[in-house]
């Protein structure tokens, strides 16, 4: 694998501002922050879930650390959540011949607690758990065993609903040879439910699931008991932020991560807090005085926070955008961090708002990054940046890991494919890559500073308009929308004018003429809001589509 992240930028920078900044980037400090966060946990195994005491204590520590490094207006704000306070679960095979041996299991945010009850029943194996496997089965008073692969087949909600509507009293999920939880025999992967499920459910390791599966395939009858130390309740979670005030205080650049986690969550997402605070500290230590106000923010409810919804992972970000509409309206760049101290990619990859692709490309050249580079555009909601992007805020994020079958970005994958450790008990400091972490901290910090230094943000909507035009199949649309050709012409005009405005912004930035900069930026953000909120929609399956009417 090539090491694109070995560029330390020290000999390529055009400005003393950037040189001072990277000279003050102390990624060892950021590593210590991430390590410290893993100490805040509900059990010896980890867990900093929204609404738990561990999440609250972590948020307070982060606030104190923000103050210590010199951030201003440090604030903790709370919001309501459905707390999933999981400690442990066990599946025990009940046998007259052998002493029962409890097998440790995980569970799923959003499933109900069972209190002190122990669920006991006969196990029925339903293979992949789709409707065909339930033919002629009576599941009343039974526990089902399901083989899952949520990354490549069906998410848990679809499979668990099949069992629930047929009367299963509990669900045991396990894995086979592909997908999360299969890289090692002793992994337990924790994933959110993304729907309403009223049936208790647990997740077993590949090793333990195989024991049950093989016995059932051999025709043996298995009776098991399920116990679960889980408390679900109404609670409050938190987000924490601090600021470096700008000369233009009502325009914002946000650097964001989240600190809630399954298990220890070193990469996902203690590393993001390390990045956010590393960049904040380096800006302060270097003496950089920003034009716009920088907000350094971390969220305590990104993994889970609301039950019975597809977007249970958006709870914290949703609370932020409703509490702070002024941030949504006036943020010129939202820089999100996920798993920032690991990589499985062959080259630099970024998830970038379409209007910022040209800017980022030009900045990479200016910073002396000459390696391969590719990008994807945020057309769905998978993390906090997606929530802000859908509100019309320009976003970007470094992409460090993939699912093992993702090839669109080119070469990738292997030991650090995301399903091999993410949301498992092996997301710990052993996955840390110091060079990747330092590269991401320096690059993202410099991009944020560079955008801050631009009075006129040179946003370009030409690429978005090209994609919109490509989505207009005029032969099909003409049947129900007689103005399809007119719509196409409007998009082409927007594309042409956008290119002109982009070039004007470049010239104005070079000339240091700032008289109408605020008006220009506000117009740019309003255009982006219209594009993202009116033109970009989701279909019934939560896939991105363009709206044409």
Where are each of the predicted segments found?
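Charged, amphipathic alpha-helical linkers/stalks
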Residues: 425-513
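Mature extracellular/periplasmic domains of secretome proteins
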Residues: 137-139, 158-171, 186-192, 316-327, ...
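Acidic/histidine-rich catalytic neighborhood of metal-dependent amide-processing enzymes
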Residues: 151-156, 239, 261-355
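Active-site-adjacent substrate-binding region
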Residues: 235, 340-466, 529-533, 537-544
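Second-shell loop/turn segments in exported
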Residues: 16-25, 43-53, 113-114, 125, ...
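Extracellular/luminal Protease-associated
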Residues: 50-52, 102-200, 371-374
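Soluble metallo-hydrolase cores and metallopeptidase-like ectodomains found primarily
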Residues: 16, 103-136, 190-266, 277-289
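Noncatalytic luminal/extracellular "stalk/propeptide" segments of secretory-pathway proteins
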Residues: 2-7, 11, 32-35, 39-140
């Amino acid at each position: 694998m090539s090491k694109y992240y070995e560029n330390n930028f020290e000999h390529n920078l055009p400005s003393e501002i950037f040189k001072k900044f990277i000279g003050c980037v102390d990624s060892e400090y950021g590593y210590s922050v991430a390590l410290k966060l893993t100490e805040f946990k509900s059990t010896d195994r980890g867990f900093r879930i929204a609404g738990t005491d561990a999440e609250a204590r972590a948020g307070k520590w982060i606030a104190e650390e923000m103050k210590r490094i010199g951030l201003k207006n440090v604030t903790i704000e709370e919001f309501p959540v459905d707390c999933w306070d999981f400690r442990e679960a066990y599946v025990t095979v009940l046998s007259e011949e052998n002493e029962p041996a409890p097998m440790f299991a995980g569970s799923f945010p959003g499933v109900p607690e069972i209190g002190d009850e122990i669920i006991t029943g006969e196990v029925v194996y339903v293979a992949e758990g789709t409707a065909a496997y339930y033919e002629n089965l009576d599941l009343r008073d039974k526990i089902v065993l399901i083989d899952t692969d949520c990354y490549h087949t069906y998410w848990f909600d679809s499979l668990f609903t099949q069992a629930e509507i047929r009367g299963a009293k509990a669900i045991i999920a396990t894995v086979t040879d592909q997908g999360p939880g299969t890289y090692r025999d002793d992994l337990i992967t924790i994933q959110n439910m993304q729907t309403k499920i009223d049936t208790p459910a647990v997740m077993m390791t590949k090793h333990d699931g195989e024991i049950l599966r093989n016995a059932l395939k051999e025709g043996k009858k298995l009776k098991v008991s399920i116990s679960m130390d889980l408390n679900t309740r109404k609670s409050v979670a938190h987000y924490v932020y601090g600021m470096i005030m700008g000369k233009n205080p009502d325009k914002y650049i946000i650097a964001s991560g989240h600190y809630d986690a399954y298990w220890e969550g070193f990469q996902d997402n203690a590393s993001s807090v390390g990045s956010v605070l590393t960049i904040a500290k380096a800006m302060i230590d270097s003496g950089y005085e920003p034009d716009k106000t920088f907000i350094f923010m971390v969220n305590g409810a990104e993994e889970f926070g609301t039950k019975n919804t597809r977007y249970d992972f958006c709870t914290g970000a949703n609370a932020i955008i409703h509490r702070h509409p002024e941030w949504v309206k006036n943020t010129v760049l939202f820089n999100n961090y996920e798993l920032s101290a690991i990589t499985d990619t062959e080259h630099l990859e970024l998830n970038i708002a379409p209007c910022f692709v040209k800017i980022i490309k030009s900045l990479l050249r200016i910073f002396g990054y000459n390696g391969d580079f590719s990008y994807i555009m945020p057309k769905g909601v998978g993390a906090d940046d997606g929530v802000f992007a859908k509100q019309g805020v320009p976003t970007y994020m470094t992409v460090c890991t993939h699912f093992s079958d993702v090839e669109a970005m080119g070469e990738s994958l292997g030991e650090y494919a995301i399903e091999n450790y993410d949301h498992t008990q092996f997301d710990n400091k052993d996955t840390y890559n110091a060079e990747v972490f330092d590269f991401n901290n320096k690059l993202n910090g410099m991009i944020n500073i560079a955008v801050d230094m631009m009075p006129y943000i040179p946003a370009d909507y030409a690429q978005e308009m090209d994609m919109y035009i490509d989505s207009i199949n005029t032969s099909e649309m003409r049947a129900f929308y007689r103005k399809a050709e007119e719509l196409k012409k409007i998009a082409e005009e927007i594309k042409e004018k956008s290119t002109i405005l982009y070039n004007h912004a470049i010239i104005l930035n070079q000339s240091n003429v700032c008289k109408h900069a605020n008006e220009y930026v506000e117009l740019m953000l309003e255009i982006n809001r219209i594009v993202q909120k009116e033109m970009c929609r989701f279909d019934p399956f939560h896939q991105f589509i363009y709206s044409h009417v």
